[in-house]
């Protein structure tokens, strides 16, 4: 706390009077009563965790924060993120360790995009400080000088299984926060006046985020339960709860309420609906360009169309080509460094309340580390767009650690998530534009090697609509691919046609939702024969998605070609053949299917 602002005297005009302090204390007591009653009625919940933070909540919501109670989605309202295992508005966090990253995204948006006065408060448990994602967020907030962000550590000593590593050694938490570059205050979390003071002082600090390390006690105000182990996530027995509620009620001295301060209304108006590219794709059939590069170009083009498009990257921007966007719009590019978990949570925060159209990009393989954050974003139905490059064995020389072979399966499990797998540059640009306007999470899967443009600039694309690239009345088998395997399917079709064997070739474009109508009609036109081919593991991939889509039709047979085993390093075309997804293997599969 070397900064003068951090040591600022608490001015008389900002101090709550004795009556206000009593009201804040009484409100904390009422919050305890509400938590006891709510958890008893459902036989589930965390009354002891609620009790430890009641004074913090009372001071924040009824003295410090500025918001309109009648308009909780107001863009000028202060934001509150509850990272403890409790429900809250704006963005769900669920498992611990995600809330601070979301708060960072909100604070970054407020400071750099909205340039508004609203502040962001994040309440965390001491237990979740064992999560690495917390410290990814701490580093991010410090690096970007998020002085509109306050993180409150509710240090109540106890976790689910007993005492936490640091217990009540408050100085350990203080030193850790200060080491990460945060302005840090230590406070008695039961003292409403002290809480009012440190939150006011935090509002005076510039160029640094503030951490408030509050010493609290789990189950505060409940005799024989306060600071006792084995009460985590346990509602109180009803007969005991009634006595405790009466005890707490006896300590309440006033029925007065406090109204929150109104927000400062200085957020800009934002329109992120019906975002359109300003011109068609500028590619010609036969051009060669990697879809990862086409994606970077499309992001820059979208950024020109709407100034609320923002791009985040995890220190891979020269490989994902998000650097193209960064060069054009550096003020709307967020470098998150090698912290994929935090990158996803920051994107969730940026997109909250409809303030931005957020795209987060990195290697698709690296997104597996962030899956828990992705999953919670899906549960919240957040409108974020995630781009995963370097997919499948077609990555080539970089080897197995860089090859995403699980990503489709991962994103298929996310409710209402749209999965784009564009084949060429034209379809990639359309995928980016469609994702910007889609509801819910979107995942765009891009490829490392250059591929040929096969669609004209005038081609139209829609979510859930596949493209039939080859078809005739003599087709015997439907071959379904996406991305890199579409080219293998087309090559197989050319070779087979020389032998008077004709196959129908489908480019899925979106893996979720599938174009079931086109798949089924094509299968029926080819005597019920389908072959899927994908640069992905068989589990959870395109083959399984297609099988599920046609499972009720006993006359349709599906044969899947997919990568099996741990891949090696090599040339892209060598690996496609080695792992059974090249044109040669498609030809063999077609002939075997016809023999059967």
Swiss-Prot record:
Binding-site residues, Mg(2+): 126, 156, 158
UniProt-annotated binding residues for thiamine diphosphate: 49, 94-96, 127, 156, 218, 232, 340, 366, 402
Domain of life: Eukaryota
One Pfam short name: Transket_pyr
Binding sites annotated in the UniProt record for substrate: 46, 232, 292, 319, 390, 398, 448
EC number, UniProt record: 2.2.1.1
Keywords: Calcium, Cytoplasm, Developmental protein, Magnesium, Metal-binding, Thiamine pyrophosphate, Transferase
An example Gene Ontology molecular-function term: transketolase activity
A GO term from the CC aspect: cytosol
GO biological process: glucose catabolic process; thiamine metabolic process
SUPFAM superfamilies assigned: Thiamin diphosphate-binding fold (THDP-binding), TK C-terminal domain-like
Cofactor(s) named in the record: Mg(2+); Ca(2+); Mn(2+); Co(2+)
PROSITE patterns, alphabetized: TRANSKETOLASE_2
Listed InterPro entries: THDP-binding, Transketo_C/PFOR_II, Transketolase-like, Transketolase-like_Pyr-bd, Transketolase_BS, Transketolase_C, Transketolase_N
Primary localization class, coarse: cytoplasm
Tissue distribution of the protein: Widely expressed. Expressed in endothelial cells and in peripheral neurons (at protein level).
Record's subcellular location: Cytoplasm
Role of this protein: Catalyzes the transfer of a two-carbon ketol group from a ketose donor to an aldose acceptor, via a covalent intermediate with the cofactor thiamine pyrophosphate.
NCBIfam families: PRK05899.2-5 (NF004559)
Subunit-level organization: Homodimer.
Family according to the record: Belongs to the transketolase family.
UniProt protein name: Transketolase-like protein 1
Species the sequence originates in: Homo sapiens (Human)
Taxonomic lineage from the root: Eukaryota, Metazoa, Chordata, Craniata, Vertebrata
């Amino acid at each position: 706390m070397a900064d003068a602002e951090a040591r600022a005297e608490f001015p008389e005009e900002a101090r709550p009077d004795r009556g206000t302090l009593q009201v804040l204390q009484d409100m904390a007591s009422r919050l305890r009563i509400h938590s006891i009653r709510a958890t008893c009625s459902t036989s589930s919940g965390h009354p002891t965790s609620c009790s430890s933070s009641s004074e913090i909540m009372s001071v924040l919501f009824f003295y410090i924060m500025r918001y309109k109670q009648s308009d909780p989605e107001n863009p000028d309202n202060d934001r509150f993120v509850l990272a403890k295992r409790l429900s809250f508005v704006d963005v769900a966090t669920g498992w611990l360790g995600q809330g601070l990253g979301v708060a960072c995204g909100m604070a970054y948006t407020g400071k750099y995009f909205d340039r508004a006065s609203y502040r962001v408060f994040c309440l965390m448990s001491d237990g979740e400080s064992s999560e690495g994602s917390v410290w990814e967020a701490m580093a991010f907030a410090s690096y970007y000088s998020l002085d509109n962000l306050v993180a409150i550590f509710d240090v109540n000593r106890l976790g689910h299984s007993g005492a936490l590593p640091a217990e009540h050694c408050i100085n350990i938490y203080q030193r850790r926060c200060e080491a990460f570059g945060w302005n840090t205050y230590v406070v008695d979390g039961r003292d409403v006046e002290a809480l009012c003071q440190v939150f006011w002082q935090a509002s005076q600090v510039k160029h640094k985020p503030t951490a408030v390390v509050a010493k609290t006690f789990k189950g505060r105000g409940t005799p024989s339960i306060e600071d006792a182990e084995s009460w985590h996530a346990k509602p109180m027995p009803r007969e005991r709860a009634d006595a405790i509620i009466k005890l707490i009620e006896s300590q309440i001295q006033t029925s007065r309420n406090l109204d929150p301060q109104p927000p400062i209304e200085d957020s800009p108006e934002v329109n992120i609906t019906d975002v359109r590219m300003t011109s068609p794709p500028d590619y010609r059939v036969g051009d060669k360009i990697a879809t990862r590069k086409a994606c970077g170009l499309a992001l820059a083009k979208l950024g020109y169309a709407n100034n609320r498009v923002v791009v985040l990257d995890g220190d891979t921007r020269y490989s994902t080509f998000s650097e193209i966007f960064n060069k054009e719009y550096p003020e709307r590019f967020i470098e998150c460094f090698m912290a994929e978990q935090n990158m996803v949570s920051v994107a969730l925060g940026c997109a909250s309340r409809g303030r931005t159209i957020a795209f987060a990009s990195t290697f698709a393989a690296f997104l597996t580390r962030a899956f828990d954050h992705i999953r919670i974003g899906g549960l919240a139905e957040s409108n974020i767009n995630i781009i995963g490059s370097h997919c499948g064995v077609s990555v080539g020389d970089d080897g197995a650690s860089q090859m995403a072979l699980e990503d489709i399966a991962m994103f298929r499990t996310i409710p209402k998530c749209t999965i784009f797998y564009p084949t060429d540059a034209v379809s990639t640009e359309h995928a980016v534009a469609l994702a910007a306007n889609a509801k819910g999470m979107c995942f765009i899967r891009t490829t490392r090697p250059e591929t040929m443009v096969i669609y004209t600039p005038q081609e139209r694309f829609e979510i859930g609509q596949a493209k039939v690239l080859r078809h005739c009345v003599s087709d015997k088998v439907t071959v379904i691919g996406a991305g890199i395997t579409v080219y293998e399917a087309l090559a197989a079709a050319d070779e087979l046609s020389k032998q008077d064997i004709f196959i129908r070739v489908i480019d899925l474009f979106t893996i979720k939702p599938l174009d079931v109508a086109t798949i089924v009609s094509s299968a029926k036109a080819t005597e019920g024969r389908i072959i899927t081919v994908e640069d992905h593991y068989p589990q959870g991939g395109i083959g399984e998605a297609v099988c599920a889509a046609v499972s009720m039709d006993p006359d349709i047979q599906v044969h899947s070609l997919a990568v099996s085993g741990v891949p090696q390093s090599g040339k892209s075309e060598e690996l496609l053949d080695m792992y059974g997804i090249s044109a040669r293997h498609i030809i063999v599969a077609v002939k075997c299917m016809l023999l059967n």
